[in-house]
A protein has these predicted regions:
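Catalytic-core signal marking the mid-to-C-terminal active-site face
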Residues: 3-9, 13-16, 39-179
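Histidine-centered divalent-metal-coordination microenvironment in nucleic-acid enzymes
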Residues: 18-42
């Protein structure tokens, strides 16, 4: 932060890392990427080469737990009024409880793995997070929510392949997507 502010100051500019410095522009997120590995750190447990999305059942359950607990989790990952101002449709900030492959408007994005290295590089990203959070609380909440999804064998529903904000209210309701 200090480096960014110092460089901006030297250029006669003002830098802001606030979640939503201007109401009509995209804000500043601090998204959380995660993967789950075996105890030896050799196998990415999110990956399944036989699944169309390349995700394991564990990945789906963990992601479903995060989505199910997202309303409460937001208190930890986006803890300020300004944080909530950032969570608006069409600003790449996850205004809806949806997930999808490389869907930058979904709350949980399946980040494509590096080509040819998907087994070791596929990961999930929580977009509803910013730098005003306490990372220990945010990560603790994320892990607890995900583990609840695993314990309850939750399923996240179908992937959302388009911006959920472009769906009608009825389409979002049919898919279980909430704001």
């Amino acid at each position: 932060r200090e480096t960014v502010r110092s460089v901006a100051d030297n250029l006669g500019l003002v830098a802001s890392l606030a979640p939503k410095p201007k109401p009509d522009q995209a804000g500043n997120g601090c998204h959380i990427h995660w993967s789950l590995w075996d105890l030896e750190g050799k196998e990415n447990l999110l990956y399944d080469p036989n699944d169309p999305m390349r995700l394991s059942p564990l990945a789906y359950h963990f992601m479903a737990g995060v989505l199910a607990h997202l309303p409460g989790l937001l208190a930890l990952t986006t803890p300020s009024y300004n944080s909530f101002r950032r969570l608006q449709p069409h600003f790449w900030s996850s205004a809806y409880t949806a997930w999808g492959p490389d869907n930058r408007e979904a709350s949980v994005r399946v980040a494509s793995g590096a080509w040819g290295q998907e087994a070791t590089s596929i990961n999930l990203e929580l977009k509803a997070s910013d730098s005003s959070n306490n990372p220990y609380l945010a990560l603790g909440g994320l892990i607890a929510a995900g583990l609840d999804g695993v314990a309850r064998q939750r399923h996240p529903g179908d992937a959302t392949l388009i911006d959920p904000g472009n769906l009608s209210d009825a389409e979002r309701a049919q898919r279980g997507i909430q704001r």
